[in-house]
A protein has these predicted regions:
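N-terminal beta1-alpha1-beta2 module of alpha/beta enzyme domains
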Residues: 1-48, 151-153
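Conserved, mostly hydrophobic/aromatic
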Residues: 6, 10, 18, 37, ...
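Hydrophobic faces of well-ordered beta-strands that scaffold small-molecule active sites
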Residues: 14-16, 46-49, 76-80, 155-158, ...
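Active-site-adjacent beta->alpha loops and helix N-cap segments on the catalytic face
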Residues: 26-32, 184-195
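Short helix-capping segments at alpha-helix termini
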Residues: 41-44, 199-206
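The substrate-binding groove and active-site-proximal loops of carbohydrate-active enzymes
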Residues: 50-55
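Internal, glycine-rich beta/alpha segment that forms the wall or movable "lid"
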Residues: 57-173, 186-190, 200-201
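Aromatic-lined glycan-binding groove of carbohydrate-active enzymes
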Residues: 165-171, 206-212, 219-230
Length: 230
């Protein structure tokens, strides 16, 4: 209901996260949730907020996100992160892995799938994507979907650490940051100069409109009610 109201009110974007081991945040697939809103929203851009890349095979992510972009007629923002919930990592068997390394390999593999033509042969440390043994391209077998937006939906990356080097690297790759909602304001503001640094490195403008900041907001009829819930 909140997403539908935001669409009616003219909000520009809305994001939804995912966790598989959190009763308080019980949306287990942000892509599935966004897909459920495709036909009911008209103008708002919808974002995965975020796909936790170490928890899914890159081929599955690439295929789902490509289809979702078509379902939304190009209104998708592709939000990604390494995932911050330890119990999610444990349930997927990645708790002791270098999840930042998995994150980078995951998004690089997704982008290679979208950039490549079948048959695929993409091999990394954690995943391998290939259709070389079974590809029959003349009948469409072994060909993966590509997103509607070219070269791909806008990529948005979570920023958690103060003075995040990841923000700089993301900006240099053409991606946009979204500062996490649990950061204190003095740490959130450190992300902007790091974003500017990354943009300047590749000669792209650093537009404040592309810097997203997540905050927890509680709306009530009066302040007393809000404080009671808090």
């Amino acid at each position: 209901e909140a997403f539908l109201l935001a669409d009616e009110l003219g909000f520009s974007e809305a994001y939804v996260g995912e966790h598989v081991t959190d009763a308080a945040e019980n949306i287990t697939s942000c892509a599935m949730f966004v897909a459920s809103l495709a036909a009911e929203t008209k103008q708002i851009r919808l974002g995965t907020g975020t796909v936790n890349l170490p928890n899914s095979h890159p081929a599955h992510v690439a295929d789902q996100v490509a289809m979702l972009d078509h379902m939304l007629d190009g209104r998708l923002n592709f939000g990604i992160s390494p995932g911050g919930l330890a119990s999610d990592a444990e349930v997927f068997g990645t708790l002791d892995n270098n999840r930042n390394e998995m994150f980078l390999e995951g998004i690089d593999t997704v982008l290679k799938i979208w950039e490549s033509e079948a048959p695929y042969n993409i091999e990394g440390k954690y995943w391998k994507v290939t259709t070389e043994r079974t590809s029959l391209t003349d009948i469409g077998q072994g060909i993966m979907a590509k997103p509607l937006q070219k070269p791909h939906p806008p990529i948005v990356v979570t920023a958690v650490a103060p003075f995040s080097k990841g923000v700089t690297e993301a900006a240099a790759r053409g991606w946009e940051p979204i500062s996490a909602n649990f950061l204190m304001p003095q740490w959130v503001k450190t992300h902007w100069p790091k974003y500017v640094e990354g943009c300047h490195r590749v000669g792209r403008p650093a537009d404040p409109a592309n810097w997203r900041v997540a905050k927890s907001v509680f709306v009530a009829d009066d302040l007393a009610t809000a404080k009671e819930y808090a």
